Amino acid sequence: MTSTDLLVIGAGLSGVAAAVAAQQAGAKVQVVDRGRAIGGRMASRRLRDTGTAFDGRVVDYGASYFTARDPDFVAIVETMIEQGVVRPWTDTFHVHNEGAMSGVRTGPVRYAAPGGLRTVVEHLAQGLSEIETETHIEELAIEPGGLRGGNHQATWAALCMPQPQAARMLPAENLPNTDLTWEPVIAVTLVFENKTWLELDGVFVNDDPVITWIADDGKRRGDDAPVLVAHVNPVFAAGHLEDPSGVLPQAIAATRRVLEIDELPAWTWAHRWSLARPISGNDEPYWLHPDLPLGLAGDAWAGGPRVEAAWLSGRALGRAMAAELH
């Protein structure tokens, strides 16, 4: 049994931000995550057994990109650009309406990572010494003087995850009464032998029953590889959460139709995100229980849902808990 000041459950961006902020304030921090690697929905993987020349290449299958508005987050992003971790990607995406490309939409600069968005979280976590992956906390027990989760005891606990996941560890009365709802997404990766589609970075696909978004991962990564990632419509995805691969025929057909691709992909893969994103965000930066030493952070807070909101929320919660500890 280990003992620590702060147990951070969830090693996505908000969890890492919380841990870093608390550690910088002098707290002893332990981070645990059920996944094989840190990053959460900032998820990347290496392609394997595709039958193409692109095995070993990284693809993002979680968050597609991120933006930066807060001055502190902007400063961190600029530093990561200088270090080669992050690259400005684009400020313009195409729009597909009523069966045809209808123009482009320009907005804030979207940032990507040559090594995959997971490397952003890994970079920010470099100063954390106590990170434990493949650790599933089934129950967070309230004990005199703190909490216990699995083999870890702590004075405080930060749950950096979607609230429905936190509800599996704690009774409902120990969590905030919010009306936030989450929608699922199935991310479909398509690897082609050659790139034959229109030069673009991504496409917002409106009013389509199958897909809502297509990212050109070659443009995102900067190597121009013929790799696409399509996000399945949440309503369609909800019917296939137990069998994500079941969306592949329709998702492949829809992607080829939108981008006018004649050839079939050489390799495809579907990944389920049951809690992909909150439909709206809470303006509060985080939540602290009024009586118990626990709190919540993530991209449903700090005005989310955005990647930046996850970082802002986690940092704010980590600082608040460190202040309570000292």
Labelled PLM ranges:
Residues 7-9, 32, 152-166, 314:
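Short hydrophobic core segments
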Residues 133-147:
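A conserved short coil-to-beta-strand element within the FAD-binding core of flavoproteins
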Residues 249, 254-292, 302:
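Flavin (FAD/FMN) cofactor-binding core of flavoprotein oxidoreductases
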